[in-house]
């Protein structure tokens, strides 16, 4: 395989993995631990 093809595929896989992990963190079971700082702040 060409080095440019391998690099392109590697970068694409990394972007998809980071996006998937972000969606899992935002909407999956770990989202129960997330806190909204605007709800915590009182004037």
UniProtKB/Swiss-Prot annotation:
Bilayer topology: Single-pass membrane protein
UniProt KW Membrane keyword: yes
Superkingdom as given in the UniProt entry: Bacteria
Keyword Metal-binding belongs to the record: no
Subcellular location: Cellular thylakoid membrane
Location (main, coarse): membrane
Pfam families, A to Z: PsbN (PF02468)
Keywords of the record: Membrane, Thylakoid, Transmembrane, Transmembrane helix
GO biological process, one term: photosynthesis
Cellular component, GO annotation: plasma membrane-derived thylakoid membrane
Transmembrane region(s): 7-27
Function: May play a role in photosystem I and II biogenesis.
Family according to the record: Belongs to the PsbN family.
PANTHER family, sorted: PROTEIN PSBN
Protein's UniProt name: Protein PsbN
Organism field: Trichodesmium erythraeum (strain IMS101)
């Amino acid at each position: 395989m060409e080095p440019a093809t391998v690099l392109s595929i590697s970068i694409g896989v990394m972007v998809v993995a980071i996006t998937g992990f972000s969606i899992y963190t935002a909407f999956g079971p770990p989202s129960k631990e997330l806190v909204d700082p605007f709800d915590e702040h009182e004037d």
